[in-house]
Design a protein with these regions (language model features):
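Short alpha-helix
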Residues: 99-116
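Short, glycine-/aromatic-enriched active-site segment of Class I SAM-dependent methyltransferases
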Residues: 76-99
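Conserved Class I S-adenosyl-L-methionine
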Residues: 122-169
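A short acidic, Gly/Pro-enriched loop at the edge of an enzyme's catalytic core
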Residues: 29-41
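A short SAM/SAH-binding and catalytic strip from SAM-dependent methyltransferases
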Residues: 39-54
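A short glycine-rich, Lys/Arg-flanked "PGG" loop and its adjoining helix->strand segment in the class I
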Residues: 54-70
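A generic alpha-to-beta junction signature in SAM-dependent methyltransferases
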Residues: 15, 50, 64-65
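Class I SAM-dependent methyltransferase SAM/SAH-binding core
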Residues: 1-30
Length: 169
C-alpha cells in the first residue's frame, strides 16, 4: 500500500537516515538485492500475504539477511482462527478468501517452526492492537474505508495484530 518515498519522509522525521533504513516496495518472492544485504528486515502488514508458505522464510527472505540479523514482522491476525465459522461482522468487509490471510498466533507458530535458518525470538499479540487498528481505519484509502464496516459492527473483538521476531542463524 505504501509509497517508499512517503515512508522515507516518515523515517527521516523519526531521525533515521537513508543509510540506516531503506524503504522497499517489491515482489517479496523475487527481491532485487544481493544476498546478505540487510542487517534487519521489517515487514508491516504484508507478510501474511506471501509468508504462509512454510518454505518462504528459508528460501525467499532469509538469504537477503546477514547472519545474526533480525526479521521483524507485524501483521493483522485473529485472536482465534474462526475460518470454519466466520462471524457475520467480519463478512461485512471481507470475503472468506480475503480472511484466509488472517490467522491466529498458533497458525503462525506452525508456519514459522518449519524455518531452519532462524530462531524465534517471539511471536505474540501486539499490545497496541486497538491503536494499530484505529490508525489503519483513519486512512482514506479504499481498503481502510471498506474495513470500517466490520469494525463498526464489532468485528474487532475477533482480530488482533501479531508480532513475529526472528534472528537469522
Amino acid at each position: 500500500w505504501s509509497d517508499p518515498e512517503d515512508n522515507r519522509k516518515f523515517f527521516r522525521k523519526m531521525g533515521l537516515s537513508d543509510e540506516q533504513i531503506i524503504p522497499v516496495k517489491a515482489d517479496a518472492t523475487a527481491l532485487p538485492f544481493e544476498e546478505e544485504f540487510f542487517d534487519a528486515i521489517i515487514s508491516t502488514d504484508s507478510y501474511n500475504y506471501f509468508g504462509r508458505d512454510p518454505k518462504f522464510l528459508d528460501d525467499k527472505l532469509l538469504p537477503y539477511l546477514k547472519h545474526g540479523g533480525y526479521v521483524y514482522i507485524a501483521i493483522p491476525g485473529m485472536k482465534k482462527d474462526c475460518h470454519s465459522n466466520l462471524p457475520p461482522e467480519l463478512l461485512l468487509s471481507w470475503t472468506p478468501d480475503q480472511l484466509d490471510y488472517m490467522h491466529d498466533i498458533m497458525y503462525w507458530e506452525n508456519i514459522i517452526r518449519h524455518c531452519k535458518g532462524a530462531r524465534v525470538i517471539s511471536i505474540h499479540e501486539m499490545e497496541s492492537n486497538e491503536e494499530v487498528w484505529n490508525d489503519w481505519l483513519k486512512q482514506e484509502n479504499e481498503y481502510a474505508i471498506s474495513d470500517r464496516k466490520a469494525m463498526e459492527a464489532g468485528g474487532g473483538k475477533y482480530l488482533n495484530f501479531i508480532s513475529i521476531v526472528l534472528q537469522r542463524l
